[in-house]
């Protein structure tokens, strides 16, 4: 699933489309997590004026309307031309006045293309926690959020009500780098540990964005370019390999239905 760096990279790669006018809208398959709106054709004639990211959502603002885009498990946008071959799971095509096409591709259909309105704002955006790269995500905030949570720290970090966009990859790497067991009860972390964790999450995410995110299977940005953060992974996806710090075999633990790779030597589980 694309995480915050991949969504941020996708948004950035779409910026050249700003101020271009939509000429036509083609829905090839409306079946996504929620159906593509039947009236999406009203985008025709409108310029794309703004692109922002909130959590793993892209907020696309046109002259009259706003849309909420989410990549789901396997979604991606691709900037193309009419000469480029269509793919089976290209669900939506926005064609701009200069002939450029913006195609939304989603084999597993867990993504969404919705109007940003009062209903979607209330349901999808309002419950979200702070952005991890914002000043609102700091040690004092995280300490208050975690002090009563008995779940493992990794589960807490992946809770969008606590902080948005810290998915499996970047939570795994942050905890590994700090020697914190992913199942360590969140409330047991000390204030110095929480400060270090906030700083490490910010560092990891910034670095991942600089490298274009992680291409583990088929992720590319809208220009078809791969990310390279996966080349720096020390724990995620490396279960059974040797720890780079102590040469102990890395182990895999299932937490919240997600695989969590850790080093039993460098990341011991500590009880109060």
UniProtKB/Swiss-Prot annotation:
Binds 1 zinc ion per subunit. DNA binds at residues 89, 108, 149. CDD domains: EcFpg-like_N. GO terms for molecular function: 8-oxo-7,8-dihydroguanine DNA N-glycosylase activity; class I DNA-(apurinic or apyrimidinic site) endonuclease activity; damaged DNA binding; zinc ion binding. It catalyses: Hydrolysis of DNA containing ring-opened 7-methylguanine residues, releasing 2,6-diamino-4-hydroxy-5-(N-methyl)formamidopyrimidine; 2'-deoxyribonucleotide-(2'-deoxyribose 5'-phosphate)-2'-deoxyribonucleotide-DNA = a 3'-end 2'-deoxyribonucleotide-(2,3-dehydro-2,3-deoxyribose 5'-phosphate)-DNA + a 5'-end 5'-phospho-2'-deoxyribonucleoside-DNA + H(+). InterPro entries: DNA_glyclase/AP_lyase_DNA-bd (IPR015886), Formamido-pyr_DNA_Glyclase (IPR020629), FPG_cat (IPR012319), MutM-like_N-ter (IPR035937), Ribosomal_uS13-like_H2TH (IPR010979), Znf_DNA_glyclase/AP_lyase (IPR000214), Znf_FPG/IleRS (IPR010663). GO terms for biological process: base-excision repair. Gene3D superfamilies: 1.10.8.50, MutM-like, N-terminal (3.20.190.10). A zinc finger (FPG-type) spans 234-268. This is Formamidopyrimidine-DNA glycosylase.
